[in-house]
UniProtKB/Swiss-Prot annotation:
Protein name as catalogued: Protein translocase subunit SecY
Effect of mutating residue 167 to E: In secY100; temperature-sensitive
Record Gene3D superfamilies: SecY subunit domain
InterPro entries assigned to the protein according to its UniProt record, in alphabetical order: SecY, SecY/SEC61-alpha, SecY_CS, SecY_dom_sf
Mode of membrane association: Multi-pass membrane protein
GO molecular function list: protein transmembrane transporter activity; signal sequence binding
SUPFAM superfamilies (alphabetical): Preprotein translocase SecY subunit (SSF103491)
Residues in the Cytoplasmic compartment per record: 1-22, 97-115, 179-183, 238-273, 330-380, 414-443
PROSITE patterns: SECY_1 (PS00755), SECY_2 (PS00756)
């Protein structure tokens, strides 16, 4: 059979076409996200809200606004952001460990994964309703903010709750669509887009502070150096691996004899990625935000106290944030990596770690190595998230230059680029396979 001219080009073009479609879908989804962040909740005076957020600079409210992509400052329907979904995911994942029924469902494979996802959606709905009620009832009672809600009453409460819940559920659906039909993790990309959208105004505000003399030029230079240093360090660690040597003994399958081979099992230093930072932020933001909204009301003074203790830079905030990061590093790594399963797969394929017996001993060895790596990864994420926060608080620069936001931006970009490269390589691999098949037919 003769080789058809231009078929290789068409195969390569088809692979690039798939990549192009996925990229365009991600871009389109992010455009929708940005448009939605400008659609306001009816009945709120945006000018008064902007004044409120100006007073809340450097507090947990500004941090919440950063994660929502500025939607909170515009009283948008996306003001809750994707945080209720993340909180629900944390709760469901924890329950799959401690609840026998959910643990069994999780073991059912694809069908179990779909059920867990469905429960997460239900949890998101409940948390979104709870948080939206908190915001809707808390806004009219904010101290010194008369006129924030133009006409407080049942109509406003109902409209605000429906708008906020609908916005969160839409963002959850949009994130799932990006994961399925786009590139990368949809939820991480939405958070990334929210942070990046606020970077230009934050940079402009910082430069303006330096120009007016409110911020010393050397401090501005130090901030720039810190940002580049953190970015470099994140890239360096995220690409770091611990390679366990794996040997394949000489074996025979049918009539073919395979010679002994040596390779390695790569284990990332930070296997959990950016998830611990996002989960920890969600855990801190949820009670702190509710306390901030309700704290001004009569009889809720104890919530004001909690809100003050949970502000960025406070000892309790630092302790809880660091503890949450370390916990979620170990928890999420245990979810995505199973040493026993890895050891069993090595044993089935005839591979072994030199000096370690296959099976149980190999599983224990891999688990020990992974535990040490996870500890290093947890300390690294804690350092990245907290040290720049202290410096940011001392220099009075926006949250966008903090360690958490920089970590999320850098890691999401790296994961995105890695998936783009994977898609391109898979399209080239398919093209090579088709080419090999055509050569076989032509003989």
């Amino acid at each position: 059979m003769a080789k058809q001219p231009g078929l290789d080009f068409q195969s390569a073009k088809g692979g690039l076409g798939e990549l192009k479609r996925r990229l365009l879908f991600v871009i389109g989804a992010l455009i929708v996200f940005r448009i939605g962040s400008f659609i306001p909740i009816p009945g709120i005076d945006a000018a008064v809200l902007a004044k409120l957020l100006e007073q809340q600079r450097g507090t947990i409210i500004e941090m919440f606004n950063m994660f929502s992509g500025g939607a909170l400052s515009r009283a948008s329907i996306f003001a809750l952001g994707i945080m209720p979904y993340i909180s629900a995911s944390i709760i469901i994942q924890l329950l799959t460990v401690v609840h026998p029924t959910l643990a069994e469902i999780k073991k059912e494979g694809e069908s179990g994964r779909r059920k867990i996802s469905q429960y997460t959606r239900y949890g998101t709905l409940v948390l979104a309703i709870f948080q939206s009620i908190g915001i809707a009832t808390g806004l009219p009672n904010m101290p010194g903010m008369q006129g924030l809600v133009i006409n407080p009453g049942f109509a406003f409460y109902f409209t605000a709750v429906v708008s906020l819940v609908t916005g969160t559920m839409f963002l959850m659906w949009l994130g799932e669509q990006i994961t399925e039909r786009g590139i990368g993790n949809g939820i991480s990309i939405i958070i990334f887009a929210g942070i990046v959208a606020g970077l230009p105004p934050a940079i402009a505000h910082t430069i303006e502070q330096a120009r007016q003399g409110d911020l010393h030029f050397l401090v501005l230079l130090l901030v720039a150096v810190l940002v580049f240093a953190v970015t470099f360090f994140v890239v360096f660690v995220e690409r770091g691996q611990r390679r366990i040597v794996v040997n394949y003994a000489k074996r025979q399958q049918g009539r073919r004899v395979y010679a002994a081979q040596s390779t390695h099992l790569p284990l990332k230093v930070n296997m959990a990625g950016v998830i611990p930072a996002i989960f920890a932020s969600s855990i801190i933001l949820f009670p702190a935000t509710i306390a901030s909204w309700f704290g001004g009301g009569t009889g809720w003074n104890w919530l004001t106290t909690i809100s003050l203790y949970l502000q960025p830079g406070q000892p309790l905030y630092v302790l809880l944030y660091a503890s949450a990061i370390i916990f979620f590093c170990f928890f999420y790594t245990a979810l995505v990596f199973n040493p026993r399963e890895t050891a069993d797969n090595l044993k089935k394929s005839g591979a072994f770690v030199p000096g370690i017996r296959p099976g149980e001993q190999t599983a224990k060895y891999i688990d020990k190595v992974m535990t040490r790596l996870t500890l290093v990864g947890a300390l690294y994420i804690t350092f990245i998230c907290l040290i720049p926060e202290f410096m940011r608080d001392a220099m009075k620069v926006p949250f966008y230059f903090g360690g958490t936001s920089l970590l999320i931006v850098v890691v999401v970009i790296m994961d995105f680029m890695a998936q783009v490269q994977t898609l391109m390589m898979s399209s080239q691999y398919e093209s090579a396979l088709k080419k090999a098949n055509l050569k076989g037919y032509g003989r």
